[in-house]
Amino acid sequence: MLRINDDDHPNEKIGFISAIKGDFHDLSSDYLKRIAAMAFPIMKEHGFGVTSLDEVAYNAKFWGRNWNKGECIELVLRDASNRWLPFEFVMDVFLHELCHIWQGPHDRRFFSHLSTLRAALIALYAKGYKGPGKYMTWDSFVLANVVGNYNTVVFNGITLERSTMHGVETCGGSLQRKKKIRRKPTPSSTKKRKLTRTGQKLGTDMNIRLELLKSPAKPQAQSMRGREARIAAALLRVDNSNEYKPKDHNSSTTLENYFVVE
């Protein structure tokens, strides 16, 4: 994402950074920016992109969550007692969520790739890297002394194992939108009304049908009797009179004056 005259943004691979509104908003926002800055080389190397990096409140279910493969990554920055979580731990959770962009389920491939990301992070720690530009130092980072103890033993530091703390799982899962199921198109209400209207049925007068068919038996479609019956019915329909008049066989208009078109 191209940003013009935006020196405050720490990571061009992340579109937006949002902290919870309240008394700790500025501190949380700065914390998230430090996380984003630290992850920039790794995200650039592996082609990761995140639309929005958001802070979420403490909960007993997860420390981080990935929505729709990087559309939004949520991180918990404070524990149940409102204490700030160590930078290493939050960074490790962020790598975990970034890995979900590449692989959804927690399988062997996922943890193998996560180990690669963690190794890259350890290499950055060894170089003293903290971020690009003004984020290269923590002189202006208010929480530096609170969250910046590298290799914190009590929180397991950076390891190649799945991290947990206070019995809370690291990840809340990789969540994706459900695909919309296309339903078969249904007729409009107007068309349905048209289909349900009762029309005038043809051939309801059994006396006329018997006279035309010359037999109560139903004729075959391709039989001579069926063809003659269809011709007789056509002649009857073009008759201007509403009442049926028996045919005058002496009249010039007879079946012999017509032929069947195959």
From Swiss-Prot:
One of its GO terms (molecular function) is metalloendopeptidase activity. Residues 8-195 form the WLM domain. Metalloendopeptidase that acts selectively on DNA-binding proteins. DNA is needed to bring the protease and substrates together to enable proteolysis. Involved in the repair of toxic DNA-protein cross-links (DPCs) such as covalently trapped topoisomerase 1 (top1) adducts on DNA lesions or DPCs induced by reactive compounds such as formaldehyde. Involved in DNA damage response and processing of stalled or collapsed replication forks by removing the covalently trapped top1 from chromatin. DPC proteolysis enables the repair of the lesions via downstream DNA repair pathways. It is found in: Nucleus. It comes from Schizosaccharomyces pombe (strain 972 / ATCC 24843). Residues 178-199 are annotated as: Disordered. This is DNA-dependent metalloprotease WSS1 homolog. Its main location: nucleus. GO terms for biological process: DNA repair; protein-DNA covalent cross-linking repair; proteolysis; translesion synthesis. Residues 178-196 have a biased composition (Basic residues). The SUMO interaction motif (SIM) is important for binding to pmt3/smt3 (SUMO). Binds to DNA. Interacts with pmt3/smt3. Its cofactor is Zn(2+).
